[in-house]
Amino acid sequence: HSGKWYWEVHALAIDNDRPNLYIGLDEGRVLDHRIINTIGSGAIATSRVYQSNGNGTKTSNNESAYGGTWSDGDVIGVMVDMDAGKVYYRRNNTIESSGAAAFTIDVNTSSFIPSFGVYEDAASADGGNVMTINFGQDSSFAAGLTSVGAQDENGIGDFKYTPPAGYVAFCTKNLPEPQCVPKDNFGIVGYTGTGVNGAAENVITGL
């Protein structure tokens, strides 16, 4: 639970009449396809999201003012500071709400996963929302934009905008090398025998 991580979302099409897009985090232990309940009346308590319709952030059923209303073509940058337990957003390379954190997360008690989706309530139609996520693999967002090739401070990633200082692409290339590797800590044991029951018929060889 450490480090500062960055990824981007291209809001290709926005329909804010309802439903609306959301980008955020959910606790990794929650096995559910939703961040926010799709009927709007019992939102999952572990969700923390930024909404496209101008209603700010949403944590469970509580909304707080933050940022603004998204438009077609906006690129939302997500900045997760696991060291400080805070999450920030940029829209078209401008940080939202004058740099205030969108919400806080408790990194000591929970694990979080990036999550994306549509929030709707019982009165919502299906809408026409489309978004593409870039963890540093393609700044064109599958040919939706002109490729830029911005990288993090480690020279990793292909982003629309350069990640802020200290933030790196949320990908395996930026993870530390594991201290415990199979070749140093595990051995292979082979068993040969005649197929007859009894330990005396089996020969054990370590490789």
Regions found by a protein language model. Give the residues of each.
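PRY/SPRY (B30.2) beta-sandwich protein-interaction domains
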Residues: 1-207
